[in-house]
């Protein structure tokens, strides 16, 4: 059987039908209609339904959900890339890497946050951000993009800046699109972060609207496609992570704008 050359997995973090329906209602209202406007994702020819409970709770969190999507294994809330007993589980990204695919991980939130982390890291706690970041090296994935890093210098602020650590070990870390286009060309492994988070912690569960100089999700995805190229097959996980953050803050317009950006 012929295998797909390009595989994209899009994840709307914390997104359910209610978020989609609210966004479509907003679009219909703008057109002066009572319903009828549909997002691109709502027009796909096939739908599937899945249970979302984790191994220890009816309500999952992003690390347990991300692990389930990445590996097919349900786990406990707060666990990342491990089973309920703490044994590492294998992400589909590693399976595809072994099958000759280049790998890209793209998100609107920190690259060491729960959903992206589930595709390359294993940790008993999703909040061990610095250690999760260090596991980027083990992955050897070719492209990462996100807002930046949580715990930039470790939990206590006493570790080496994580971008310097990663650069010392073979990754090019670029902040913003201009820096990416200038520095990433010809590099094997690249991490694209937002210009607004250079040399500092990325924001966490903050949904205050896009920062003007920051790249959009579509722009980061385009950079990933460009970097991975067409010589080898590739897999990209692309997450609209701040959809969830708008939900945490009970802020409907950030939810709507982030769903639209994701769509």
Segment roles from a protein language model:
Residues 78-80, 211, 253:
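Short, contiguous strand/loop micro-motifs
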Residues 176, 180-194, 220-241:
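Active-site regions of oxyanion-processing enzymes, predominantly non-cytosolic
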Residues 139-141, 150, 188, 193-212:
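Formylglycine-dependent
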Residues 114-119, 197-209, 224-225, 229-263:
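Active-site His/acidic residue clusters
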Residues 1-155, 160-184, 188-189:
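N-terminal catalytic scaffold of extracellular/periplasmic and nuclease hydrolases
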């Amino acid at each position: 059987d012929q295998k797909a050359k390009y595989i994209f997995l899009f994840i709307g973090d914390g997104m359910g039908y209610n978020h989609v329906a609210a966004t479509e209602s907003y679009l219909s209202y703008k057109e002066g209609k009572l319903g009828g406007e549909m997002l691109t994702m709502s027009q796909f020819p096939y739908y599937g339904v899945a249970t979302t409970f984790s191994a220890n709770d009816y309500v999952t969190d992003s690390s347990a959900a991300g692990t389930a999507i990445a590996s097919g294994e349900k786990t406990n809330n707060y666990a990342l890339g491990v089973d309920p007993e703490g044994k590492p589980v294998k992400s589909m990204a590693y399976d595809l890497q072994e099958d000759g695919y280049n790998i890209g991980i793209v998100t609107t939130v920190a690259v060491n946050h729960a959903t992206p982390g589930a595709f390359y890291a294993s940790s008993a706690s999703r909040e061990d951000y610095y250690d999760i970041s260090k596991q980027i090296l083990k992955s050897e994935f070719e492209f990462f993009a996100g807002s930046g890093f949580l715990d930039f210098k470790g939990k206590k602020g006493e570790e080496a800046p994580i971008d310097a650590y990663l650069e010392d070990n073979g990754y090019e870390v670029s902040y913003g699109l201009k820096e990416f286009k200038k520095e990433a060309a010809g590099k094997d492994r690249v991490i694209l972060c937002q210009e607004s988070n250079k040399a500092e912690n990325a924001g966490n569960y903050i949904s205050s609207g896009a920062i003007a100089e920051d790249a959009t999700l579509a722009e980061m995805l385009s950079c990933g496609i460009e970097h991975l190229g067409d010589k080898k097959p590739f897999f990209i996980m692309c997450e609209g992570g701040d959809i969830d953050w708008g939900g945490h803050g009970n802020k409907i317009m950030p939810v709507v704008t982030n769903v639209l950006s994701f769509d």
